[in-house]
Amino acid sequence: MGEAVAGTVGERFRELYGAEPEGVWAAPGRVNLIGEHTDYNDGFVMPFALPHQAVAAVSRRDDGILRLHSADIDADPVELRVADLAPGSDKSWTAYPSGVLWALREAGHELTGADVHLASTVPSGAGLSSSAALEVVLALAMNDLYALGLRGWQLARLCQRAENVYVGAPVGIMDQTASACCEAGHALFLDTRDLSQRQIPFDLAAEGMRLLVVDTRVKHSHSEGEYGKRRAGCEKGAALLGVDALRDVPYADLDAALERLGDEEEVRRLVRHVVTEDERVERVVALLESGDTRAIGAVLVEGHASLRDDFRISCPELDLVVDTALASGALGARMTGGGFGGSAIVLVEAAGVDAVTKAVEDAFAAAGLKAPRVFEAVPSAGARRLV
């Protein structure tokens, strides 16, 4: 598949720019198995890469010009001056790739421009890190073409800075690290404080199970308000408890910490979610490493309840997916991603895939909702050069 995609993207690059690209790169979207809204609290996460990916054909320029083109937009390439790139200067889709060049230059790397053609199969607005895939694929291309010598986690940090400062979205580090560092057949157990990581084998098919992603097709944007409010509330909780981040509140001390927060009810809810979610990540790692994979289903259900009731970022469509899937025999289910729409994941026996899928589709139809998009999530390769 990689060669075919590279050929198509390379051919379009030639049509646009009249020359061969110097290379073609790919970076995947991700789904988060467990560990939601913990990354900006220095906590634990456990994503894996999807087969859906952003692909970029790229060549260097030496005249300070950056030209960007997307296969999704019927328009000529957007032309920008590298020296003029600045936070807030770009409000369109091009902010994600141009922000990467800005972040690399801010970090002291001399980049003299590029011609870029981008194509992506990562669903936008589905909570599957379409923006991170765009950032990481261009960062990897720049790293290779300009021989910057940066490692995956370093590229992820720069991409996060691009999205935080240049785009203005207060995202954590998980999405970019997952896209840059995941390995096929594994979930990534990531400590977001120091970016230490462990690849955990995750082969559901070998155990007779599947993980479905259900895209509700309800769109959301991290840049709009609610995500930032949750992050600010978590930071307030850490300050009130006298810790650097909520990751520093031990699970065993949670009740005492909640008592100390007194009548700060909203902050109490946010703190409870983050501390218990970190514990859930560690529990899932232990279950997978001990071979008790089916037992992670119950942990997913716990996580959804916490996101719905404490963090309050679910929505009726996500709850409908989870409730319907569980009623139809799924082993576990929860919302995934930033919330307020997007996707849910469903752990199901292989023999039950069709029944659960039909039940969810029928439930959406009965509720008068747009048909959800359902697909199997297979742990796939992280960012890499195709050609």
UniProtKB/Swiss-Prot annotation:
Enzyme class: transferase
Residues at which Mg(2+) binds: S131, E163
Domain of life: Bacteria
Ligand binding (substrate): E36, H37, T38, D39, Y227
BP GO annotations: galactose metabolic process
Subcellular location: Cytoplasm
Stored InterPro entries: Galactokinase, Galactokinase_bac, Galactokinase_CS, GalKase_N, GHMP_kinase_C_dom, GHMP_kinase_C_sf, GHMP_kinase_N_dom, GHMP_knse_ATP-bd_CS
Binding site for ATP: S70, G125, A126, G127, L128, S129, S130, S131
Pathway assigned in UniProt: Carbohydrate metabolism; galactose metabolism
Active site: D175
Keywords, comma-separated and alphabetical: ATP-binding, Carbohydrate metabolism, Cytoplasm, Galactose metabolism, Kinase, Magnesium, Metal-binding, Nucleotide-binding, Transferase
SUPFAM superfamilies: GHMP Kinase, C-terminal domain, Ribosomal protein S5 domain 2-like
Cellular component aspect of the GO annotation: cytosol
GO MF term list: ATP binding; galactokinase activity; magnesium ion binding
Site location (Transition state stabilizer): R30
Catalysed reactions listed for this entry: alpha-D-galactose + ATP = alpha-D-galactose 1-phosphate + ADP + H(+)
E.C. designation(s): 2.7.1.6
Family of this protein: Belongs to the GHMP kinase family. GalK subfamily.
Function: Catalyzes the transfer of the gamma-phosphate of ATP to D-galactose to form alpha-D-galactose-1-phosphate (Gal-1-P).
Name of the protein described by the UniProt record: Galactokinase
Gene source species: Streptomyces coelicolor (strain ATCC BAA-471 / A3(2) / M145)
High-level lineage: Bacteria, Bacillati, Actinomycetota, Actinomycetes, Kitasatosporales
